Amino acid sequence: MDIISGQALFLLFCFISSCFLISTTARSRRSSGRAATLPPGPPRLPIIGNIHQVGKNPHSSFADLAKIYGPIMSLKFGCLNSVVITSPEAAREVLRTHDQILSGRKSNDSIRCFGHEEVSVIWLPPSSARWRMLRKLSVTLMFSPQRTEATKALRMKKVQELVSFMNESSERKEAVDISRASYTTVLNIISNILFSVDLGSYDSKKSNEFQDTVIGAMEAAGKPDAANYFPFMGFLDLQGNRKAMRGLTERLFRVFRGFMDAKIAEKSLGNYSKDVSNRDFLDSLLILNEGDEAELDNNDIEHLLLDMFTAGTDTSSSTLEWAMAELLRNPKTMVKAQAEMDRVLGQNSVVQESDISGLPYLQAVVKETFRLHPAAPLLVPRKAESDVEVLGFMVPKDTQVLVNVWAIGRDPSVWENPSQFEPERFMGKDIDVKGRDYELTPFGGGRRICPGLPLAVKTVSLMLASLLYSFDWKLPNGVVSEDLDMDETFGITLHRTNTLYAIPVKKQTIN
């Protein structure tokens, strides 16, 4: 069932069920003294509040409303009180000044339906000992500078496999599905870090199945759902999100259990590496699972792998696809990026990660992609752990807080020509995506900043540089750059609605 028809169904149900909410409405009216200090927002309809204004692309709908009601805006979705942040100044307040109070999580029904919020490093509150333990494990075993450096050769190998696939497609003059190809590359990088195996192949359906599963889960987790606004309706599963999410995550859990069982069997035979540096992520987790005082059980491991797998694969491949789409739509920008690489690297070379620091225009292209197409347009929803004042307005306890980084990246008061893809805006400017410049925070900030940020930036930059250095690119079937659509499909991760196909043309001067 699509979003629009699903919304119509639950709006009708809301009307029929309104009698159950009379007491809630009355309590809200009795609290009018505090409401005077709430951020401004659009008028609310009885019972449903502002649900009718969400639309199928909430990040865009909220951006339009913010033009009227300001950079900190109150919305009510059924029983759910929300505040939407739409300026760098307000984002700083949330992500830095009041980070501790606003670092809770507001999980949705599709996350709660399989108990993920109770064991997930993404959804647990930072105040919990379990979150601190899982966060430490994630950083130490996967995202630390030492681990990132240790997997550099792996990234290089997998990106060269991508280039080889593009070479074969170029020889056949075939258009390539950029999303599928980039996902296969990122999938194999992440699966080797986690399990020491390739899970994807460029000439099989396996990668496609994984990508469809992960994208389906991210969309189910992110799209509007009646149960998020009226929790008592969750058991009805009006839009089928619970059923979809349980089915999708169970597929991934089966894969994880297979690897866990295989590694446990190998270890029982003594076939495992005693060299810590050679252990993959799952090896290290299973060691922590041993003994009577184990820090983790199998359920913890499955859910942690789910966090690492979904967040690590989908976001990076989506960003690469958006970057290629923008460059194909702006061919002069592509030529400029390629000219920089030819000048710096010369000919008949292979792009190394160490080369990226000497390619400022390429880095600007990546930043510009993050600005216009942040992987998580509203970040992951935060929750106020207590009442807190933000820019002079009261954000009550338990309010959902959404930081609309998509809208901030397109704010004309912050960016000149905000809708245009212009990497030049970053040249000579010390602006990065590390959570310190609040006009550009695609990975969040504060204690909730994405720990995989360095790995993601390295992976996307190396993939993009390698594709631009080795190939020229053209659109298939006579499509001209001006006609390339940039429609979006909303979820926790923001995807292109329509598949991006492009034909790689091998450069004659590159071996």
From Swiss-Prot:
UniProt GO MF annotations: 8-hydroxygeraniol dehydrogenase activity; heme binding; iron ion binding; monooxygenase activity; oxidoreductase activity, acting on paired donors, with incorporation or reduction of molecular oxygen
Transmembrane segments: 3-23
Highest taxon in the source lineage: Eukaryota
Pfam families documented for this protein: p450 (PF00067)
Cofactor dependence: heme
Predominant location: membrane
Subcellular location: Membrane
Enzyme Commission no: 1.14.-.-
InterPro entries, per database record: Cyt_P450 (IPR001128), Cyt_P450_CS (IPR017972), Cyt_P450_E_grp-I (IPR002401), Cyt_P450_sf (IPR036396)
Binding site for heme: 450
Protein family per UniProt: Belongs to the cytochrome P450 family.
UniProt protein name: Cytochrome P450 76C4
Source species of the chain: Arabidopsis thaliana
Gene designation per UniProt: CYP76C4
